[in-house]
Amino acid sequence: MSIYVGNLSYEVTQDTLSAVFAEYGTVKRVQLPTDRETGQPRGFGFVEMGSEAEEAAAIEALDGAEWMGRDLKVNKAKPREDRGPSGGNRGGYGGGGGRNRY
């Protein structure tokens, strides 16, 4: 299971985020998604710890903590399929303008 880390500074790197979480146990993996077009960080990331106990300790200590001038939001990451509809499907009708044929 992963930890979601939100409200991150755009200056954060995988190394700096890993160092913060390493205080609470073994960091197995850090992901910092970036914007496809700009390559800039998107302000959130995911951290995978060595055990559930280490994850719980990190979440307890870091949720709401200030780091790099921002208040972190730290909690268990939800699996993709549990996040509800993606918003990609906007429904039927193909679109045609507002002109009346008659």
UniProtKB/Swiss-Prot annotation:
Look up keyword RNA-binding and say if it applies.
yes
Keyword Chaperone applies = no
Q: Which PANTHER family match?
A: HETEROGENEOUS NUCLEAR RIBONUCLEOPROTEIN 87F-RELATED
Q: Compositional bias of type Gly residues: which residue ranges?
A: 85-102
Question: Which portions of the chain have biased composition (kind: Basic and acidic residues)?
Answer: 73-84
Q: Which GO terms describe its molecular function?
A: RNA binding
Name the keywords, alphabetized. RNA-binding
Q: What is the protein's name according to its record?
A: Putative RNA-binding protein RbpA
Report the domain of life of the source organism: Bacteria
User: Could you tell me which residue ranges the RRM domain spans?
Assistant: 2-79
The record's SUPFAM superfamilies line, in alphabetical order, gives: RNA-binding domain, RBD (SSF54928)
- Residue ranges for the region (Disordered) are 73-102
